[in-house]
Amino acid sequence: MLFISATNTNAGKTTCARLLAQYCNACGVKTILLKPIETGVNDAINHSSDAHLFLQDNRLLDRSLTLKDISFYRYHKVSAPLIAQQEEDPNAPIDTDNLTQRLHNFTKTYDLVIVEGAGGLCVPITLEENMLDFALKLKAKMLLISHDNLGLINDCLLNDFLLKSHQLDYKIAINLKGNNTAFHSISLPYIELFNTRSNNPIVIFQQSLKVLMSFALK
């Protein structure tokens, strides 16, 4: 199981998750995408949420899948899951134990289960648990996606520091957009220096699909 988080919201988790799953499936690795918790959605009028996009991809493998099969807590409010849950469904806190069981059931059918979190590692799910706690409970490997803008060095190093302090395998990958020419002169020089001293180098996502698939499966 691979848990995908990010340095922050809008870093490109969903895009990267879909690209990695498509690559894995093309390589013969049967891969499903799950979005157990999603906020800022209105399923009655908007069918382009992260989970809807995942469902579209997943149905290439199993036409019987529905949104409820891959996304279990869905809220209208654009906020951390804890805040949305307390406002919209205060008597039904998110049960990560139940989620863990449901997500692990997919490992019986699929070679690789990709779980996308909401926001970054410290986003609260309950008063006691955040996204990193959830990934640890799942015993999943972690793929952390970084944006490619100015400030990514600080964001990557902070997340690397946090992840190193926990017992889980992780990789950090930069979601490099094709039109970002500034990255190569502003941020890449430090990333290359960092990688010479680190036993867990930061990679560029688009250049590392094979590496990331191998990491997820090993």
Curated annotation (Swiss-Prot):
GO terms for molecular function: ATP binding; dethiobiotin synthase activity; magnesium ion binding. ATP binds at residues 9-15, 50, 116-119, 175-177. It catalyses: (7R,8S)-7,8-diammoniononanoate + CO2 + ATP = (4R,5S)-dethiobiotin + ADP + phosphate + 3 H(+). Keywords: ATP-binding, Biotin biosynthesis, Cytoplasm, Ligase, Magnesium, Metal-binding, Nucleotide-binding. GO terms for biological process: biotin biosynthetic process. Its main location: cytoplasm. Substrate binds at T39, G151, L152, I153, N154. Homodimer. Catalyzes a mechanistically unusual reaction, the ATP-dependent insertion of CO2 between the N7 and N8 nitrogen atoms of 7,8-diaminopelargonic acid (DAPA, also called 7,8-diammoniononanoate) to form a ureido ring. This is ATP-dependent dethiobiotin synthetase BioD. It comes from Helicobacter pylori (strain ATCC 700392 / 26695). The gene is bioD.
